Amino acid sequence: MVKREDTDDTSTQAVDGAEVESNGQGDAGTDSSPWSIESETVLFNSLCKFKPVGIHKHFRMISLSASLNYYFSESPKDAPVFSHQDVWDKLGTLYDLDGLDELEYVADNQDSDMDEDEDDEAAIEGIAKRSQMKEFVLPFRDYGFLQIEQATAVASEQSSPAMSREQSVLEDGPTAGDEKKGLADDDDESSDLDELDDEEMKLAETKIKVEGEQQEREENGGEEEHDTMEGSAEPEEAEKSEEEGEGEESGESESESGSESQSDSDAQTGRQRRTRAATAAAVRGRGTSKGKTVRDKKSSPSTRASSAPRRSTRRKATTEPEDTATEREETPTPKKSSGGVKKPAPRRSTRRKK
């Protein structure tokens, strides 16, 4: 009895020890497993990139395990290291790898599976076209305007108060009526400026025209006086030839007075020409070509025709008697002194007192 009891006790103790050993080994195995919630999450993330199914499943497994180890490489020293076999064992507990290989093979060879059921074909096509699926997007035809309104509302909320102030200033800017009024005022000012320019141009043209006519009259008058003086000098010289001394003095005085009048007329003509040139330059600087037409008119044949009477007068003056011509040739020309032009002596009457 005792022995029996001892044997029973020993048998029960042996069974309990075996259970404890098995439990200890199980706990140690679970503790040494590299898989955790974080590692499984990284595994599923890598499965989305590298699918170890089909002909290239081993190459994809290399990339998958490398992705796992790279993620944990920056962790502390006790970070887990995953081998290819560890990953295959974990996937074998989660999926039917043989069934997935068959489905992948069927998807690659759809032409050889035409005799299968419609349900199987639909499942195979869904698996084969999984990579071609597009992300769901709301149709723009129905929801596009709502999206635009929401985007503009968010943008307006994020805008700075400075921008809002600038927009308010722009909105409170001048109205359309004020803009039209401003444009009309600008047009009036420009038209006034144009009118002023036209008036100034007209005044300048009339001034140039009057000066040109005055200069022509003075030139004509100076030449006529010179011709008349020459014509009147001829009978006087004829009378003065009766008395040699008196004739020589009167001839010198007349020649000197003629030279002085000629020099005065030349100086006056030079001053008028300079004034005329300055006025023409001012008008030319304003960018008008009307002054040129006035100057062209002055140099036209009609203006030249005004010198015809002078030529006829000169011809008449040159047609003088031979006696007076010889007397004029005999009379000596007046000599100028070094001090300047000699003043004319007072004219003496050549008529004899009766």
Swiss-Prot record:
Output compositional bias ranges, type Polar residues: 22-34, 155-167
Record has Transmembrane helix as a keyword:
no
Q: Which residues are listed as membrane-spanning? A: none
What InterPro entries does its record include?
Eaf7/MRGBP
Name the Pfam families for this protein: Eaf7
NADP is among the record's keywords: no
UniProt GO cellular component terms: NuA4 histone acetyltransferase complex; nucleus
Keywords per UniProt: Chromatin regulator, DNA damage, DNA repair, Nucleus, Transcription, Transcription regulation
Task: Give the record's GO biological process terms.
Answer: chromatin organization; DNA repair; regulation of transcription by RNA polymerase II
Region Disordered: which residues? 1-34, 155-354
Q: Where in the cell is it found?
A: Nucleus
Q: What is its main location?
A: nucleus
Q: Where is the composition biased (Basic residues)?
A: 344-354
Which residues lie in Acidic residues bias regions?
185-200, 221-257
Specify the domain of life of the species encoding this protein: Eukaryota
Low complexity bias located where? 277-286, 300-310
Biased composition annotated in UniProt, kind: Basic and acidic residues = 201-220
- Role, per record: Component of the NuA4 histone acetyltransferase complex which is involved in transcriptional activation of selected genes principally by acetylation of nucleosomal histone H4 and H2A. The NuA4 complex is also involved in DNA repair.
Entry similarity comment: Belongs to the EAF7 family.
UniProt subunit comment:
Component of the NuA4 histone acetyltransferase complex.
What PANTHER family has UniProt attached to this entry? MRG-BINDING PROTEIN (PTHR13581), MRG_MORF4L-BINDING PROTEIN (PTHR13581:SF5)
Q: What is this protein called?
A: Chromatin modification-related protein EAF7
GN (gene name): EAF7
